[in-house]
UniProtKB/Swiss-Prot annotation:
Signal peptide: none annotated. GO terms for biological process: cell wall organization; isoprenoid biosynthetic process; poly(ribitol phosphate) teichoic acid biosynthetic process. The gene is tarI. It is an enzyme of class 2 (transferase). This is Ribitol-5-phosphate cytidylyltransferase. One of its GO terms (molecular function) is D-ribitol-5-phosphate cytidylyltransferase activity. Catalyzes the transfer of the cytidylyl group of CTP to D-ribitol 5-phosphate. It catalyses: D-ribitol 5-phosphate + CTP + H(+) = CDP-L-ribitol + diphosphate. It comes from the Bacteria. The record marks R14, K22 as: Transition state stabilizer.
Amino acid sequence: MIYAEILAGGKGTRMGNVNMPKQYLPLKGKPIIVHTIEKFILNDRFEKIIIATPKDWINHTQDIIKKYIFDSRVIVIEGGTDRNETIMNGIRYVEKEFGLNEDDIIVTHDAVRPFITHRIIEENIDMALEFGSVDTVIPAVDTIVESTNHDFITDIPVRGNIYQGQTPQSFNMKTIQKHYNNLTDDEKQILTDACKICLLAGEKVKLVNGGISNIKITTPYDLKVANAIVQERINS
């Protein structure tokens, strides 16, 4: 089976003085998260589309879905204390409700990346089925510098080898669950990226090409850019 999990656990602290998490802010008349969900319901390969949200925002999320989304595959669950725990909550939900099979995969995506394309979703599904672990990336445009002391440059990696991470990140569910459960509590605090967990466990993580417009809306500037993208698509 193929599942999607939209990660809607962000608090929106970088968005400034707003009274709700950023995924619920309006984008051309609809909450950002609705734009994101709409991209996933267009894909009929998903058995369920899981929305993982903070406990205090479950009812609000359900109300939004009733208003905008008419697809019985969409369900809302409580997210975890951090990103990886939220992913695991999605897997635990599937395990409890349907059981886990060896080839079950989950496509995890940021709720605040509303411009994901059908192509990116399809490639994540196909590559996760084949390779087990997938990350979505775009080539780095700017030169990246590393500073281990936060004062002087300690390294400048070759730009041609550097990519910027996006989402989705997609996984064989049994495999990522096993690797996560093998971590110590301290490791769980340090390893905040699920793909890093796979790498440390010796798994190869397949790259899927993302897109320049697959932006993450985390700041007021990002929201302005997102509105401009939507307006441009309306005009065209």
